[in-house]
Amino acid sequence: MLKSFLSAVLCLLLAVPVAQAAEANPEQLLASLKFQQGKITLPGDIATLDLPANFRYLPPADAGRLLSEGWGNPPGFETLGMIVPAAVNPLSREGWGVVVTYEKQGHVKDDEADSMKYDELLKTMQEAMAEGNAERKKQGYQPMTLVGWAEAPHYDKANHKLYWAKELHGEGDTQNGLNYNIRVLGREGVLVLNAVAGMDQIGQIRNEMKAVTAFSDFTAGNRYADFNERTDKVAEYGIAALIAGGAAAKLGLFGKLFALLLAFKKVIIVGAGAAVMAIGKLFGRKSKVDLTKSP
């Protein structure tokens, strides 16, 4: 069931035409971005980022400009902002960032975390990706392979934070891509932190993401422990669906970001949950550049 659902969603994603992003002067773009430091309250007062000196934050408008004008995505994708390292130019080859979003789809129960069979889940995800390659080719995209876990899923039950990373390979590519994911479970939804980088940066990203999780937290009243079973909605999916890449199949949602790396561009693709609501905002590029890291 999960495999068929994933395959169907992959076909949906690939069937949507996407726009080309406008090119921008890198120096002018970088100078115009309004980086922030210190303690940041995210839009909607849903969560905070207590940034150390080696990280900076871009508010939603500037994050959107970096994603579109700097990294080659069509404009219009809504985020809560981005976290970027202070010492690295985000427009350079070494540049990377963490896209922050929030999914208010209900309180995710973590009862299954201790009993999850992640090897079986990986196999299902690999099979789903392989089945989607026929449609990828049909739409003009290169076939993709989910190589395996770059970091096996693990759940911090005390802090309600889920971590995992996937290694992805695009046919003909010399470098594999890294999709590093963190989900912070909250009262009514999930804070999504997706790192955009290359597989050769796995050691750095793994260390840096430990810091990112340490300074990211929900505000009072929105934390996991604040859940009220009498008044709050429970999500119709659990830990496995978060890792597989989507919300409950019965809801028809996919709701995840796929972090991608192009040769010199970083591209974000939204999942079918957002596609159902705003199908024209799918992120990706088909002919102008080589799509290298997309589930």
List the predicted regions and their residue ranges.
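Extracytoplasmic/secreted envelope proteins and their assembly/folding machinery
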Residues: P52, L122, Q126, R206-T213
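C-terminal single-pass membrane-anchor helix
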Residues: A235-P295
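Short conserved aromatic/hydrophobic patches within beta-strands of well-structured domains
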Residues: A53-P59, F215-D217
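Positively charged n-region of N-terminal signal peptides that target proteins for export
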Residues: M1-S4
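Bacterial N-terminal signal peptides
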Residues: S7-P17
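Intrinsically disordered, low-complexity linkers and terminal tails enriched in Pro/Gly
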Residues: V16, Q20-P26, T292
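Extracytoplasmic/lumenal ectodomains and periplasmic regions of secretory and membrane proteins
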Residues: E167-A235
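Conserved polar/disulfide-associated segments of primarily extracytoplasmic proteins
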Residues: A22-T48, A61-L178, L185, M199, ...
